Design a protein with these regions (language model features):
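Core catalytic lobe of class I
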Residues: 1-95, 99-103
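Conserved hydrophobic residues forming the short capping helix/wall of the S-adenosyl-L-methionine
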Residues: 110
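Acidic, low-complexity intrinsically disordered tails
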Residues: 118-120
Length: 120
């Protein structure tokens, strides 16, 4: 028997910005981001992970909070989208993923797109 009850799905996600010693950078042309900002879903990029974030969204966040040459760390790399976005922006990126299948899928996902961007 199937359940007819509605399933609730969250309509937002939270992010953490970790920094050491001094306040984080904020490269947003003087505009504030108060509690949230809207983003259009990315339905074009193939999904390799159930909680995969859109690369354009991650690129925007990385642009705001880092400069070229900075390091971006993703402790739960999943699809590798954060690593791809960081590489596209000239940041060094390190990701960690405990699940071997996700690691393998993310590795293919990121490397194929980095190689595409090198030859375009």
């Amino acid at each position: 028997q199937t359940c007819a009850l509605p399933i609730l799905v969250g309509n937002c996600e939270y992010g953490l910005l970790l920094y050491r010693d001094k306040l984080p950078k904020f490269n947003n042309d003087g505009r504030m981001i108060f509690n949230c900002f809207d983003w259009v879903l990315d339905n074009e990029t193939p999904k390799v992970h159930s909680t995969q974030k859109p690369v354009p969204l991650l690129r925007r966040l990385i642009e705001i909070f880092t400069d070229k040459g900075d390091v971006v760390i993703d402790p739960c790399a999943g699809s590798g989208s954060t690593l791809l976005a960081a590489a596209q922006l000239g940041r060094r990126a390190y990701g960690f993923e405990i699940k071997k299948k996700f690691f393998a899928d993310a590795n293919k996902f990121v490397l194929s797109r980095i190689q595409q961007s090198l030859f375009q």
